[in-house]
From Swiss-Prot:
Cellular component terms (Gene Ontology): cytoplasm
Protein name: Iron-sulfur cluster repair protein YtfE
CDD domains according to UniProt: Hr-like
Gene from which this protein is expressed: ytfE
Its job: Di-iron-containing protein involved in the repair of iron-sulfur clusters damaged by oxidative and nitrosative stress conditions.
Keyword Metal-binding attributed: yes
GO molecular function per UniProt: metal ion binding
Localization terms from the record: Cytoplasm
Main location, first listed in the record: cytoplasm
Protein source organism: Escherichia coli O81 (strain ED1a)
Length: 220
């Protein structure tokens, strides 16, 4: 099967660094992971042949860890340590930096107005979301009750969509996370951190939406 006929979420999980490639082209492989590469490329008016060629090159490299076949308990432990704990570190620091940048550079036209507010909203939403997963959903899945978790999973997926929408607002506010020429060191460091957060959050959501939740619902 050609790559163009496969879902973005599947490609992101099966080809090393495909997620970084999709991020470069601003293609949503986490919340929009069920759309095929061809459809996603058409929506962005991108040349699918070029992207397929880049994916073929990436596919020559061995994948570090194939989470598609990992035990669900191992996936959950990985999500908590690699993503949940990391987001809890990332967001408070980014909020502090955004507060400083918005205050110090308030008179500059390029200042990302409202960024502190949007990062704070994301922090509050994610904190509540991750707590619900860790206290309710993940224990259910680990106990083999994932097939009965349709309700909690649909809520989590809906909250993933909301987080994805906030990321789009943050990208819009920051000129696609591109610092202007006059950006100070804090401003540049903050944008590096936001890019890292977006990468991490998209990988995190993709792992849950495209692997953990479907397998749990299937009764594993």
């Amino acid at each position: 099967m050609a790559y163009r006929d496969q879902p973005l979420g599947e490609l992101a999980l099966s080809i090393p660094r495909a997620s970084a490639l999709f991020r470069k082209y601003d293609m949503d492989y986490c919340c929009g992971g069920k759309q095929t590469l061809a459809r996603a490329a058409a929506r962005k008016e991108l040349d699918v042949d070029v992207i397929e060629a880049e994916l073929a090159k990436l596919a020559e490299q061995p994948i570090e860890k194939d989470w598609r076949s990992a035990p669900l308990a191992e996936i959950i432990d990985h999500i908590i340590v690699r993503y949940h704990d990391r987001h809890r570190e990332q967001l408070p620091e980014l909020i502090l930096q955004a507060t400083k940048v918005e205050r110090v550079h308030a008179d500059k036209p390029s200042v990302p107005k409202g960024l502190t507010k949007y990062l704070t909203m994301l922090h509050e939403e994610l904190s509540s979301h991750m707590m619900k997963e860790e206290q309710i959903l993940f224990p259910m899945i680990k106990q083999g009750m994932g097939s009965q978790a349709m309700g909690p999973i649909s809520v989590m997926e809906s909250e993933h969509d909301e987080a994805g929408e906030l990321l789009e607002v943050i990208k819009h506010t920051t000129n696609n996370v591109t610092p202007p020429p006059e950006a100070c060191t804090t401003w540049k460091a903050m944008y590096n951190g936001i890019n890292e957060l977006i990468d991490d959050l998209m990988e995190h959501i993709s792992l849950e939406n495209n692997i953990l939740f479907p397998r749990a619902l299937a009764g594993e």
